[in-house]
């Protein structure tokens, strides 16, 4: 059922194959169930009862506020998608939230659940994850009725007999827009993007995460506060993360013509174009491309204008550095291992 929801709109043809079904089950339903099982395991150990506590937003740390912001943004998105019969979009929004909840929030908050006693920080973590699990179950109930019913009966009905008898008798969740903080969501997305690129750099350099790294440099649209930098350093096992406006000391670019598009437009000048592109200062050319949207130059009296679609761009790095980049961010990892790091 989930495979058909998320794969394509109901009125379009759908190719069915077993591997895709298994992958869909693992990616969403398996992740949701594992997160629920994580909560239940530690809630049972601590005899946690959500009816005895309240969720005080003003007392919450940043990670809790981020998850609640994502949760309420997801409610709005899923509700609107279902209103307009956008089934795949609603399913993808649910899947994306569950991925963030499991692979980022729980990952970053596990030690809070392991703490001894029931200090306020631990209560905050329990209440935040409890709220997220119950709410996402209600949002997903029309699509996965049986799993969400199990979650609801165990998390809600077992401690509150006044609650509706079934999740399918509950109202669809309504977003609390006061909990939505788009700046917080954007900053955390940048953290996640940097972490993904940093891991890719480690993989390229064949350096495992347990090996500390001295320095990482990030060129992005805006820098992040120390709170987020500390998360990046911890996730990537890097001693120092530095935001910079220029990574020229570590990287450069090479340009070649995209023959499919450049050939039909400038066939006779193709040789001259290749020669010109090979002679460019890579960083200066990339700056021009981003600023003007094209590289403009003259070849044998013919004006040539090449957009990003007309170019094959490769990023090269200096020895001892590995980099990853997309359209708005570059991450450079210093792979030089000093005796102190080893």
Describe each region flagged by the PLM.
Residues 20-342:
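Feature 926 captures the class I aminoacyl-tRNA synthetase adenylation module centered on the KMSKS loop
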Residues 13-21:
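Short, solvent-exposed helix-loop connector elements
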Residues 1-14:
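Alpha-helical recognition segments enriched in aromatics with Gly/Pro capping
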């Amino acid at each position: 059922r989930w495979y058909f929801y998320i794969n394509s709109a109901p009125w379009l043809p759908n190719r069915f194959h077993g591997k895709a079904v298994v992958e869909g089950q693992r990616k969403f339903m398996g992740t949701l169930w594992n997160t629920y099982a994580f909560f239940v395991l530690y809630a049972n150990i601590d005899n946690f009862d959500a009816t005895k506590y309240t969720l005080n937003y003003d007392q919450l740390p940043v990670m809790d506020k981020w998850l609640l912001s994502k949760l309420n943004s997801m409610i709005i998105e899923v509700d609107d998608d279902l209103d307009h019969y956008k089934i795949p979009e609603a399913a993808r929004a649910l899947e994306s939230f569950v991925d963030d909840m499991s692979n980022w929030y729980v990952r970053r908050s596990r030690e809070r659940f392991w703490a001894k006693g029931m200090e306020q920080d631990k209560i905050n973590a329990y209440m935040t994850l409890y709220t997220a699990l119950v709410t996402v179950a209600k949002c997903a109930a029309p699509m996965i009725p049986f799993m969400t019913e199990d979650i609801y009966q165990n998390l809600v009905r077992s401690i509150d007999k006044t609650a509706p008898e079934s999740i399918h008798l509950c109202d669809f969740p309504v977003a609390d827009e006061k909990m939505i903080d788009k700046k917080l969501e954007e900053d955390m997305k940048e953290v996640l993007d940097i972490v993904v690129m940093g891991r890719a750099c480690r993989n390229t350099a064949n350096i495992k995460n347990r090996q500390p790294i001295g320095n990482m440099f990030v060129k992005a649209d805006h820098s992040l506060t120390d709170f987020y930098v500390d998360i990046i350093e911890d996730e990537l096992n890097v001693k120092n993360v530095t935001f910079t406006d220029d990574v020229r000391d570590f990287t450069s670019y090479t340009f070649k013509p995209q023959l499919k598009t450049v050939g039909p437009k400038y066939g006779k000048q193709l040789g001259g174009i290749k020669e010109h592109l090979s002679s460019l200062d890579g960083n200066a050319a990339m700056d021009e491309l981003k600023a003007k949207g094209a590289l403009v130059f003259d070849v044998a009296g013919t004006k040539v204008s090449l957009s990003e679609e007309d170019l094959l761009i490769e990023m090269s790095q200096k020895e001892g550095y590995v980099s990853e980049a997309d359209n708005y961010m570059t991450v450079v990892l210093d792979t030089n291992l000093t005796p102190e790091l080893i």
